[in-house]
């Protein structure tokens, strides 16, 4: 049989040439032979169900199932296709166009024009498995022998990824005018997509599945080796042994997930001193640099999907790490936090704030209280602090005041009053969010320290804004 007229049925099923396409389905409809293992398992299940619909329909009864007239019957071509004892059987009176459409598209795309072996069976196979076992036993035996022969012949063609040379040989046999892309061949409802084939093949040989889906199998393995060589250096102290190069389709994904969690958990210790380690996973996840070992173009999932999901995961988990850090910090320092918080609120935001003299060991409190978390968190909170600085400067706060006479030292009365107020606020549940409150209140502490009279007079603008801020934190 000439391979150049093997065209999918939905392209020209009005011409008599397409009558060869029912033979493309050969024995797949009803025969559950081991010959079908590893082939199109999904489409076989699909077409068994369609067999039950088409072949057991009202047209097919046990008496007249052999020569039932049908719209899709091409007697001349069918009798030409299969001769001899099969001549009376090849009518196939039950709508082969609909049921064979998936196999035509499948063999056209995956096998590469394998129609020449399939015409021997004719299309009598659609009766099998449907409770019509009217063939003589000799025909069944012959058919099984032919199945075994075809099993050997189809090995290379069924799996072009296992034998790329055979696939290259069969590629030119396609008709030149036949469109083979997805855009020219929109997949119909009964045509299984290409990913089904790749999934089926990938159970047996994942590397072959990758090379079938992508034309560069070497780039994937190079990608895997690069990944395994880069990843252990990142989370060496977190995972005891490095992950070997991926051998299953999910292995390299899990590898990347481990690397992601590992880099995040390592950034919990180190990211607060070096801000680059926090931003580095996000930059890599954005997928902008194709040279990074994790997002090379040979990934099975598109890099854009991975990057968007990983970006959201990383940002979400980074905030979780931050909240955990704040929580543990609050728990660790809960014992001596009340004294430190009093000192935190009294002294300035940083050392270079208003140059006032320190009293009552405020320098030590500053080291224990506010400066320590700022050092640990590094530049993670710097953008919010800068925004608050800008807000305070816009409201009239001066970091380096020109009038130094405004900067008066604190007195004992002020300290006592402030201790009483903070103790009262802590009883009201003000200290529940501990560290955050001390940070925010310390931002407003220059107003308290510079404006002694306004601090005692609760009707002024600054102290009213202060009390409203405290109420908001309750």
UniProtKB/Swiss-Prot annotation:
It comes from the Eukaryota. Residues 262-277 have a biased composition (Polar residues). Residues 26-38, 136-154, 317-346, 356-365 have a biased composition (Basic and acidic residues). The modification Phosphothreonine is found at residue 301. One of its GO terms (molecular function) is RNA binding. GO terms for biological process: DNA-templated transcription; positive regulation of DNA-templated transcription; regulation of DNA-templated transcription. The modification Phosphoserine is found at residues 49, 76, 202, 292, 382. Its main location: nucleus. It is found in: Nucleus. Residues 17-42, 91-191, 238-371, 453-474 are annotated as: Disordered. Residues 116-128 have a biased composition (Basic residues). Keywords: DNA-binding, Nucleus, Phosphoprotein, Transcription, Transcription regulation. Residues 291-312 have a biased composition (Low complexity). PANTHER family: VASCULIN, VASCULIN-LIKE PROTEIN 1. Possible transcription factor. Belongs to the vasculin family. This is Vasculin-like protein 1. It comes from Homo sapiens.
